[in-house]
Amino acid sequence: MDSNTMSSFQDILMRMSKMQLGSSSEDLNGMITQFESLKLYRDSLGEAVMRMGDLHSLQSRNGKWREQLSQKFEEIRWLIEEVRHRLKITENSFEQITFMQALQLLLEVEQEIRTFSFQLI
């Protein structure tokens, strides 16, 4: 993962963790957990691509990697919808900026994962 994407993940996670969204803090914690999981998955997929020919290693580590890939895309779509929803309902400019940046990052990561997966297929 390039350093800009890495720092974007870290920045957004830090700022989201500081937010207090009232009764929905449990939902926010779930979003933070999914962001972290997505970051780890994206990193591992990127490493496999960097070691081109490592498809067999990836398949042996996770025989159902295509199913996992599909699940990750579903998680990304859910996160995108959740972030869009939060963006619509919040009036706090700090939260709006954070969620706009989170949305942009999700779209970038979705594209990167698509690119990596096509290289591995």
From Swiss-Prot:
Q: Which InterPro entries does the record cross-reference, listed alphabetically?
A: Flu_NS2
Q: Listed GO cellular component terms?
A: host cell nucleus; virion component
Determine if Thylakoid is one of this entry's keywords: no
Q: Does the keyword ATP-binding apply?
A: no
Task: Provide the alphabetized UniProt keywords.
Answer: Host nucleus, Host-virus interaction, Transport, Virion
- Biological process GO terms, please? exit of virus from host cell nucleus through nuclear pore
Origin superkingdom: Viruses
Where in the cell is the protein located? Virion; Host nucleus
Q: Coordinates of motif Nuclear export signal in the sequence?
A: 12-21, 85-94
Family, similarity comment: Belongs to the influenza viruses NEP family.
Could you tell me what this protein does?
Mediates the nuclear export of encapsidated genomic RNAs (ribonucleoproteins, RNPs). Acts as an adapter between viral RNPs complexes and the nuclear export machinery of the cell. Possesses no intrinsic RNA-binding activity, but includes a C-terminal M1-binding domain. This domain is believed to allow recognition of RNPs bound to the protein M1.
Q: How does it assemble?
A: Interacts with protein M1. May interact with host nucleoporin RAB/HRB and exportin XPO1/CRM1.
Q: By what name is this protein known?
A: Nuclear export protein
